[in-house]
């Protein structure tokens, strides 16, 4: 069953064609890796899918519905950036709950959801701490927890394993596996490293610098 369809996506940047009538189909609960060097359009495509980039032609369909016809807060698509973008003045609990508070979930429901995702992402003992008290790998886990707390249908990860040492990288990759299996989430991630796609048993799309798709 298809969850994401891109139809005839065209996009240019500074007179350079990045996508030229690009088509793509993703099935539910798949993991797909976008592999290639910097500057070849991988992150741009995530932004097109997520709705942050709107200056393109073509159609992005989620479950067969054009995303432009779905209110932003109902799209069930979450993008996690390479920079963790945590709020330094908020506790880890407050960082994770932020999107739920914006959507005005009931307080008792928020608490339950934060505690559940904190357990899944191994953050139970960090909820009262602040980002500066956590290591880089722990901060990445917080960003991941915040991204998946609403259990989106589609999770977009922009270089989620970059800048991590080997042990922490493996830990984060295993958490991505857990998210897909437990939350039935479809996942697209950007990487430069084919071994990450192989470890996650992901299908992959290869991007080449200087060539449009």
What residue spans do the PLM features occupy?
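Helix-to-loop junction immediately C-terminal to a conserved catalytic motif
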Residues: 50
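Catalytic Walker B motif of ABC-type/P-loop ATPase nucleotide-binding domains
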Residues: 155-158
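Hydrophobic anchor residue at the start of the ABC signature
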Residues: 144
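Conserved ABC ATPase signature
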Residues: 130-134, 138
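Conserved ABC ATPase "signature" region
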Residues: 108-126, 177-178
